[in-house]
């Protein structure tokens, strides 16, 4: 079944498929085949970012599969990318998007997100660091970056724009100056970080929420030895047995029923296909609440740095760091 049938509408009428292919941590050598396979089995939503350093390979897949006389029409595909932290200066925004478009071999994006609210030093080094290993920050106001992003919509380079990793206060701050409203907020979200308040905040303001790491990001580099493993959660495994589905499919179904878009990453064909097969069953209201009640406010994705031999949150020193607020 194609995920193309199962979507939510953005405030501007665009339709975003509820399941997309995530590409963070997908190796350049593998990502082209993963995207081609995903498109062949019915995916119509691909989530990308300049900072993942694999957009050119994704572009090769698009070139083979998408466009006039190809299997998929461009207008049937939803492509997201993200503006990186080193490109927040208003003058850098359009060139950054044009580079992404050239890499992806596309004329426009369906959605362009500001990847984080905080900026790094301008330049082409994705992770500019001081000699002691800490990040070199820039203090461009994200509202100025937003105003530059609005021009991309006027120019037809992006159909919609949005935010990633912003907290509720920062979202309202952007809304206070926006002439083009953010259409989407993309954040980490899964039963251990259910984000109920943030989702309600967004839905009230007309933003659709996309969940990254919806399966708890089992392949991260920095792992805490004591962290809970979402795919091993007994309640989830029990539901998987009941519906003859995998624990991953239960997690994705839970989000789809909440009208939350998910972008599970995989380069394995069997998993790519399985992640799409969540539209042939439903969880009961009781089961939905049970999965939601597993929340522990456990954030798996906090970028870390090693400073003086100790792991520390990479961006906590920036005034716009989003994770100090309750939500």
From Swiss-Prot:
Compartment annotation: Cytoplasm, Cytosol; Apical cell membrane
InterPro entries: AKR, AKR1A, Aldo/ket_reductase_CS, NADP_OxRdtase_dom, NADP_OxRdtase_dom_sf
Residues binding NADP(+), per UniProt: 13-24, 47, 164-165, 213, 215, 217, 265-268, 271, 274-275
Site feature Lowers pKa of active site Tyr, where: 82
Keyword annotations of the record: Cell membrane, Cytoplasm, Lipid metabolism, Membrane, NADP, Oxidoreductase
EC main group: oxidoreductase
NADP among keywords: yes
Pfam families: Aldo_ket_red
Active site: 52
SUPFAM superfamilies documented for this protein: NAD(P)-linked oxidoreductase (SSF51430)
Molecular function GO labels: aldose reductase (NADPH) activity; S-nitrosoglutathione reductase (NADPH) activity
Catalyses which reaction(s): a primary alcohol + NADP(+) = an aldehyde + NADPH + H(+); S-nitroso-CoA + NADPH + H(+) = sulfinamide-CoA + NADP(+); S-nitrosoglutathione + NADPH + H(+) = S-(hydroxysulfenamide)glutathione + NADP(+)
Biological process (GO), any one: cellular detoxification of aldehyde
UniProt EC number: 1.1.1.2, 1.6.-.-
GO cellular component, one term: apical plasma membrane
Function: Catalyzes the NADPH-dependent reduction of a wide variety of carbonyl-containing compounds to their corresponding alcohols. Displays enzymatic activity towards endogenous metabolites such as aromatic and aliphatic aldehydes, ketones, monosaccharides and bile acids. Acts as an aldehyde-detoxification enzyme. Also acts as an inhibitor of protein S-nitrosylation by mediating degradation of S-nitroso-coenzyme A (S-nitroso-CoA), a cofactor required to S-nitrosylate proteins. Also acts as a S-nitroso-glutathione reductase by catalyzing the NADPH-dependent reduction of S-nitrosoglutathione.
PANTHER family xref list: ALDO/KETO REDUCTASE
Family: Belongs to the aldo/keto reductase family.
The protein's name: Aldo-keto reductase family 1 member A1
Lineage, uppermost ranks: Eukaryota, Metazoa, Chordata, Craniata, Vertebrata
